[in-house]
Amino acid sequence: MSLITLTTDWGLTDHYVAALKGELFSMLPGVNIVDISHQIPAYNFMKAAFVFKNAFYFFPPHTIHLICVDKQLNRTDDTHTGWMVVQYGESMIVCRNNGFFTLVSKQEPLKAVYIEGSEEVSVAHEKSFLVTLLHDLVHNKPLEELGQP
């Protein structure tokens, strides 16, 4: 049985978190999802790192952690960052390539891959991308097949 944690700046006043969870439950029957927080101030990946770091070490090995912070939709500049999948110990951390992981740990990860962000910027597209990525991680797809080292 897989365990996925969610840390986002999406809040709880609309449908976004529920839609992500619904799609995860549909694609991954039996998965357990734990909310670390959805009340991170918008785009504040430093606060997200603080909250996540203080919860991360209490989760069992093989947990997959998804951090969705620092993704400003409808940006018109080219500061759009891709995603990182970081193997830290026996767990996986999925986060933006924005320095988040370096705020969580000073240790080098066992493995890390970069996944290029899409040109399409929408919540629906991001949700679909993340659900597919989490599906691949739950089914132990090698990191090297997901992105570039």
Positions of PLM-derived features:
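N-terminal glycine-rich anion-binding loop in soluble enzyme alpha/beta folds
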Residues: 2-39
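Active-site histidine-anchored catalytic micro-motif
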Residues: 3, 27-32, 44-54, 59-69, ...
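A residue-level signal for conserved active-site and pocket-lining positions in enzyme catalytic cores
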Residues: 9, 70, 133
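Anionic-ligand-binding alpha/beta catalytic cores of soluble enzymes and soluble regulatory domains
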Residues: 116-149
